[in-house]
Amino acid sequence: EMKDLVNKTGEYIAKLLDVEGATVVSCASAGIAQSVAAVLVKDSDWLLENLHVTPIENNEIVLPKGHNVNFGAPVGTMVALGGGKLVEAGYANECSADQLAAAITPRTAAILYIKSHHCVQKSMLSVEQAAVVARKHDLPLIVDAAAEEDLHTYYRSGADLVIYSGAKAIEGPTSGLVIGKTQYVEWVKRQTAGIGRAMKVGKEGILGLTCAIEHYLTATKESGAE
């Protein structure tokens, strides 16, 4: 059964990466959309099936302005697919922890941080700093680390959900990986009965990425940073 495969592979990957939870999705972009939907819908069966027809008061997703990029599609489009409304913090060339916090309102549902070469690199707060802001305001932190090589650091830095591409650094099939805190990952998995149905990943993608992660964790790394 597909649900059993999703659960078993997720548990196995989580154990490999020493994280609370993990699930395979169709791609990193789907991971963003489903993560946003997850923090909005949570356990609501009504919102799960009526995400785009029911007004949601607390639907703002705050991210640094310099992270609002087009990576092949706009970040804002993925946020909107998940039912969120994008709110930019800071400026195109800088965003501090204080500027991020200043953009938070009672309508804020989550903080989104994009770790990518597409983004502005200088004068931007770190994932660790974003995590501190998120904790202070009792908000989840979602980190899109699609092409990043390190499968541990962003989770350990305090992110509640971290999204990776299965086909980039991991060199697996076209797929995505979402890791994070148990409750948030479970909410992402629920989206298979919501917007995630249109982003469904097949058995081949799930098993292929699982095998690719096994290999990735044991293979000798040739990092561009070396």
Predicted feature residues:
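Structural signature of PLP-dependent enzymes
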Residues: 215-226
